[in-house]
Amino acid sequence: MLFGRRFHVRANYKVRTTIALHLVTPAGTLLDLILRVTKDQIWPDLLYIVRHGESAGNVAREAALEAGEHMIDIDVRDVDVPLSDLGQRQAIALGRWFGALPPEKRPNIILTSPYLRARHTAGLIAETAGMREDAYSLFVDERFREKEFGVLDRLTPLGVKNQYPDQAEFRRILGKFYHRPPGGESWCDVILRLRSATEMLSREYCAQRVLIVCHTVVVLCMRYILEHLTEEKLLAIDKKTEIANCSVTLYEHDATLGPRGNLRLKLFNFVAPLEEAGALVTSEPDVKIGAR
């Protein structure tokens, strides 16, 4: 029988765990199990957040706007919208940039939205960067998917006003942060699912180098969570900045930020890898973005 026996377990990735077991009575009728977990670091070393390359939906939306159309002409589910030729070149250019980084700066964990354009971007980045299959892990995570627009799917802003004037008015009153179209999501809904994903980053990928390939609203909402922004600050960033395709937002762990350190924003909407490679920089919103 164990009395006050203490076990110390040194876990991976700078995590210190102490387990104390105390049997209070010889009969063992009471087991006092104390699990104390302390972490020197609770965040990844590096967190890259990348918007996918230009998609066929981006191109179709731009054409619909120029023609004054109400609907965006695309014949597949938004989940299945592929990259355009330019989008593939953008992803390849970004992959070369990652490949030129020192090994300790390259991602070893890739998390991607299940949407085809994001998965294709993630695959091209890994392939072009020359990442060996045994040097990284890639996971598809639906929490990083595009914001869902419900009945407003594939409508241009003009189409929303024409077909759903009540929703256009609700959005004007509530603002994009809180407005939830029927069958769709508000920005708050996206933030709710991303909070779960952010907890996973801390729990499973502490001290790792993580790349997330996702969508415009996800990039912005991750900033909202990680930097504890307000609605006003987030919407000010959104108003000022169009998130470019294959742009990089980077957070680095800074041990000086609090007792366990924290993530510090180092890059936002960084497009130099595309410019250096001569790939056109684009920022057209996604196909469903008429009421983003």
Please tell me what each predicted stretch does.
Residues M1-D45, G258, E276-R292:
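Eukaryotic N-terminal low-complexity, Ser/Thr- and Lys/Arg-rich leader segments
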Residues G4, A27, D32-Y48, A56-G57, ...:
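Phosphate-coordination/substrate-recognition cap region in phosphate-metabolizing enzymes
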Residues H52, G87, H215:
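Short, conserved phosphate/pyrophosphate- and ester-handling motifs at nucleotide-, phospho-/glycolipid
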Residues E62-D78:
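A solvent-exposed, charged loop/short amphipathic helix patch at secondary-structure junctions
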Residues I74-P82, A168-C188:
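Short glycine/proline- and acidic residue-enriched helix-loop micro-motifs
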Residues T112-S113, L192, V213-C214:
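Short beta-strand scaffold positions
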Residues R119, R195-R260:
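Active-site-adjacent alpha-helix immediately C-terminal to a catalytic or transition-state-stabilizing loop
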Residues L265-A277:
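Short, solvent-exposed aromatic-acidic interface loops
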